[in-house]
């Protein structure tokens, strides 16, 4: 069974037209714990691959309205440095901060605005903090940010289930208020997300 763990109902509505018979959709709610719980539930109910799709923030050369595949994710608010000396984002059972995801075969061929494969930073923050920017971009090398993706990938890694993810960027650091950009671009980006979902997901069935 192919399962989709999606944070918000508006994102779920964008993905629904792409679902095929046998697919299941789990609307988790926002944040890492919600996303992890929904992912675990999906796996317990028989999912053998997990997909996470939605809107995200961006850094650097990403574009508003662009669609990007996630090849690895990191929890940038996970920090055990004072306990065991590991770098920010390194989970207790890992040697690297990066959680690998599966690539979506042929994505660049079917999604018109596909911008390539990126690193996603996930944390329970929605803000414009400068220290987050430095950590995410310079230390961790991420160009996408959300509040769920790495948690979904973390559970999948622990359970041995393939995880796929793609994001549509609504706001880019340096382009003005993050909240203002998100509100201005949300509906357009949901439309782009819907088209990308149909192109990617129908092709795989």
What do the PLM-derived regions correspond to, one by one?
Residues 47-58, 148:
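A short, hydrophobic beta-strand-centered structural micro-motif
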Residues 163, 168-205:
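Regulatory input/activation interfaces that engage signals or partners
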């Amino acid at each position: 069974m192919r399962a989709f763990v999606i944070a918000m109902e508006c994102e779920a509505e964008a993905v629904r037209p792409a679902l095929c018979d046998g697919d299941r959709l789990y609307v988790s709610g926002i944040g890492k714990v919600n996303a992890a719980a929904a992912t675990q539930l999906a796996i317990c109910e028989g999912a053998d691959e997990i997909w996470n799709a939605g809107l995200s923030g961006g850094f650097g050369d990403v574009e508003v309205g662009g669609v990007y595949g996630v090849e690895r994710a990191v929890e940038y608010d996970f920090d055990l440095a004072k306990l065991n000396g590991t770098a920010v984002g390194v989970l207790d059972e890992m040697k690297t901060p990066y959680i690998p995801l599966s690539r979506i075969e042929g994505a660049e061929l079917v999604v018109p605005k596909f911008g390539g494969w990126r690193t996603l930073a996930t944390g329970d923050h929605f803000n414009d903090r400068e220290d987050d920017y430095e950590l995410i971009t310079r230390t961790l090398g991420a160009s996408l940010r959300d509040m769920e993706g790495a948690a979904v990938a973390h559970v999948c890694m622990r359970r041995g289930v393939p995880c796929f993810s793609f994001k549509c960027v609504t706001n880019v650091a340096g382009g003005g208020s993050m909240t203002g950009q998100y509100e201005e671009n949300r509906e357009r980006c949901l439309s782009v997300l819907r088209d990308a979902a149909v192109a990617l997901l129908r092709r795989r069935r």
